[in-house]
């Protein structure tokens, strides 16, 4: 099976390697060597390590398309990767998550066949009920990612825009709110079964970087403490 993977990354080859290694080992019914990775690598914390990230990506994926922007920007990164994808569904894989157990990708794709309005299958990273999209690892249908790719406002957080919060943003997608029943499925359904681990939080605590001191809506990059 061939599928586009999209990744928004920082220049952290060790973190990226842990992420791709875990998904390569635990995703079933798909071979990453048959897939294309579309990756945006921001110049943080060290821009000169971006080539190392591409080398890591090439270990796992059959084809890698990369972008080296001059400035780090979360929304711009999403715009770039999604506007370059073209498969019916994509696997959106942020660079600092580890998959802890096997997941059958074909099983996840059958959800889109069973539910016409379905836009995203979220892999469970938290115990709460998912009624809004999160950009932790997920599978997106093209009716979602193609509507957003290239159309996100760069000074507003992409998750906020995709959730349809009221910040005066008019997106080209008429039903951008994902709170309606049938547009999000969380896998696995059992809230106690967390299959993802965030490895980015522990990394950031050990560095000189932190989140911008702004509201969630305005968070688009990291800054030095």
Q: Predicted segment positions?
A:
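Active-site nucleotide-sugar/metal-binding loop of Leloir-type enzymes
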Residues: 79-89
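Short, well-formed alpha-helical segments that are part of the catalytic scaffolds
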Residues: 12-27
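C-terminal catalytic/acceptor-binding lobe
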Residues: 18-19, 147-225
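Conserved nucleotide-sugar donor-binding
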Residues: 86-87, 134-149
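Short beta-strand-to-loop acidic/aromatic patch adjacent to the donor-nucleotide binding site
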Residues: 88-98
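Conserved donor-nucleotide/metal-binding helix-loop-beta segment in metal-dependent transferases, i.e.
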Residues: 101-125
